[in-house]
From Swiss-Prot:
The organism of origin for this protein: Jannaschia sp. (strain CCS1)
Protein name: DNA ligase
GO biological process: DNA repair; DNA replication
Pfam families named among the record's database cross-references: BRCT, DNA_ligase_aden, DNA_ligase_OB, DNA_ligase_ZBD, HHH_2
Xref: SMART domains: BRCT, LIGANc
Amino acid sequence: MSQPDQEAQALAAGFSADAAKTRLAELAKRLSDANTAYHAADAPDLSDADYDALKRENAAIEAAFPDLKRADSPSDQVGAAPAEGFSKLTHTQRMLSLANAFDAGDVPDFVAGIRRYLNLGAEADLPFTAEPKIDGLSLSLRYEDGQLVSAATRGDGAIGENVTANARTIDDIPQTLTDAPDVLEVRGEVYMSHADFAALNDRQAEAGAKTFANPRNAAAGSLRQLDASITRSRPLRFFAYAWGEVSAPLAATQSGALNTLKTLGFQINDRTKTCHSAEDMLAHYASIEQDRADLGYDIDGVVYKIDDLDYQRRLGMRSTTPRWAIAHKFPAELAWTTLEAIDIQVGRTGALSPVARLTPVTVGGVVVSNATLHNEDYIAGRDANGGPIRDGKDIRVGDRVQVYRAGDVIPKVADVDLAKRPENTAKYAFPDHCPQCQSEAIREEGDAVRRCTGGLICPAQAVEKLKHFVSRAAFDIDGLGAKQVEAFYLDGWIAEPADIFRLKENYGEGMKQLRNREGWGEKSATSLFNAIDDKRSIALHRLIFALGIRHVGEVAASDLARHFTTWKALAEIVDQAAPAAEAHRRAEDAVLAERKAAADEGRRASLQPQRDKAWADTPEPAKAAWDDLTGIDGIGATVAVSLVTTFQQARERASIDRLITELTDIQPPEARATQSAVAGLTVVFTGALERMTRAEAKARAEAMGAKVSGSVSAKTDIVVAGPGAGSKEKKAKDLGIELLTEEQWLDRIGDA
């Protein structure tokens, strides 16, 4: 395992659930911004190495805390919303991104995971294709009756930019096809060769025009010209590697389908190879990496795909990535520089995050002057359990440090050279008070992060909460971004979300008017007021996410919205669950104390009596509400406690209630598939499944509109019980819930 992977896993292991949730939120925001810069603006502010390692840390935390995975998780994001200036095209099948492998050990893990999912033994032949990952711009070409009718960029995966006129100017893209299916969407990568890129930049320089930073930027900028004649003048190329909607199968295998595309006239990468083991895949990866500089175009890794298309169908998709493919990325780069200072930033949840200020250094073609230091343990050279990292070397101001382009919120400091440490340097003393409001900053047991206790009196937290409220996945108010929110807060115009909806009332007329602020006018002020009024009607999952409740990301917000469907129902259950949440806290504390006492006394811990005692006086309605909350698939005790804590804090609850009064319509979630026998039903799988794995069963049930829960309750409709079902099967019988065998379930969904 590589050093960056080890560090990422060590950091993830040291996180408490609260700290992990906070970190995932930070990563999600930074990567969302990077996606917009990369896909929509053709002006990336992170290199591929930065971006990939950002996602690597996110993946490590998600692996350690799978229940905390967010709806806006970087591993679930595809591209960015289409830019203004182009009409939009909706993809009939989403253009997905790929999961990443960053280390050689990830590849056999990927293969083993697929074998487990498909219930394939080690002896079963399992071919993969391995092809270079082109560093360009993804494009989808739609052909109907052999004619090119449209071309669209990836966009956000669901909707892309209509670049049909520009695509027609690319020589590698056929205008007509012979003997093609009636409907065929061909997907691939628009790119520019090294030679063509150099020649283009020479012409740009001679004309006094802007030159491009790299071939990828040149290709993306050229394809996304509003004037197709400019695109025609640029030497763009296209490799086909996949397909979307197709009216007739291209082949039975990935490799066969690529050959079909080649026969139809598309350029297929000739370094694509079929491999029969992880060892073959890694050998081909090494071969391509060795030849990388001589290929004549940029690549940033190798893509592995299951060759058998029936297996691809069975494996299916995650939210934004296929289970049957992975991109094995080339390693990032390192550089050494001097740590000039350590600054402390305060986040939305009060987390104190140390940031290294560095002597600027070029790492992989990008100048880096800031890097993350994660938390106080990382600076001290230890993990959250006290174990050493970096061989226990601490980090001090003045040190010579190694910067890894891991793309945290910023790149990260990976190592320190003690031989070059200046004399008389002092160990860094992490602050125990908030640098913004001077409130005490405490570190709770089990938490890797120190947090400001100031709450809403802390300006840093208040501003970050407001920024979160207007973020893209929350209320997403047109014309009201982070910059405007911060300015309004600093001037005393807004202090909480409800104030946003009173801006027109307070600053539309009178002495202090929005239209008279610098940078504003009559038209822009009116547009903002209208945009705010438009968001008085909001989807329930967006409202829940916008509140910025700790541990409640987009995934949890969507799960809660689907389960409760109305704000009133959610609020009532959370309120009713308050005594149970307190009992849960008491039980956790009691169990921890009992474990410690048992260890000190050399005896076996007696945990259940401690839990029973803590829960003894809890009212039954509170227990039922708690079971309702924690029984939602993906919503555990950590999220439930966080919800209750927020709702029980008088100031927070009053702020939420004021917001609710400003809203006119809270929309229930859109219904999932309704044309199946199990749509809308809550299903629990228990025991051993023989025809499919648990993951496959869950994915197929959800695809048919069912809701899969991890626990049996009165709201459960069906329990699918295999051998060894145990207590869940018994509870289903006691509650009179329909029990099905695996065969009966498959018969019910029409897949026996």
